Amino acid sequence: MVVETIIIIVIWVILLIISINSLYQINKKNKSRISFKESMDLTELPVITFINNNVKLNFLLDTGSNNSFINKSILNMLDYKELNGASNIIGFEGNKIKNSICEMKIEYKDYIFDTTFNIADLDASFNVIKQEDGVQLHGILGSLFFQKYKYVLDFQSLIAYMK
């Protein structure tokens, strides 16, 4: 009788641990979700707002770009570390562009993302987007960001979530 009671208690403890772990995983997954629904509703562009140095930064989500970019004109307000070397980018017309690179932490809710950015003068492009769509962009997050942090873009639900 005592052995059977101990076995039942052990089974209940195991089930309790499994349940707690499952709830933790669900909560973690829900906290890591980043919605871009509002920006899609307003501008039809997938944009997410992050924070660096108490400055709100709007990033366009661009899976067609490998690299991430930060606009050179905003850097004086940000906390970043310029890295040695440069990155060679191939533009739409096939032209090679040499960019400086920096490392910068960007925050979303409780998450901090340490990311490498190409520094580029994006004022002309971003001004056109601001005039046409009404959103001020500060940078672009490319596919290497999504790969590094295991984020998937779900355009049906209009969220990015950690896999």
Model-derived segments and spans:
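Pepsin/retropepsin-fold aspartyl endopeptidases
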Residues: 1-163
